[in-house]
């Protein structure tokens, strides 16, 4: 039996990932962590025999408790209400985005074992500082985000 943790599991990608894992949830222990509570999604997660924990990745004790013996962590948690351009940003918003991205991720890295697989997807936003529009960006392309996200 594998222990799988999904942070940010109530977001779009997290919900889709839970759907994929729903066929395996009777054989593996799957824990979904999110700081939000969306009744419909939480009920579906529970119907799939997954455990839902309402909590924040900034809570080091909570993350340690649920990630310390995980086999796989899908780290999807992050601030999604991000400014589109720098003029829409504030220091407080940038600081929260940074704190969740850096400290929250560090909490997970500190909690997991060396044998644990961690999957951390990204988005096109890391390429937003390019000089021109590019199609077919490759994985080894230099990133140059201009916003905190």
Residue ranges and their predicted role:
Residues 103-144:
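Conserved Rossmann-fold NAD(P)-dependent oxidoreductase catalytic core, especially the SDR/UDP-sugar
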Residues 50, 57-100, 128:
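NAD(P)H-binding glycine-rich loop region in Rossmannoid oxidoreductase-like domains
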Residues 3-24:
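N-terminal Rossmann NAD(P)H-binding glycine-rich loop of SDR-like oxidoreductase domains
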Residues 7, 33, 73-77, 118-124:
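SDR active-site strand-loop-helix element
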Residues 26-39:
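Conserved glycine-rich Rossmann-like NAD(P)H-binding loop of the short-chain dehydrogenase/reductase
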Residues 146-149:
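Active-site Tyr-X1-5-Lys
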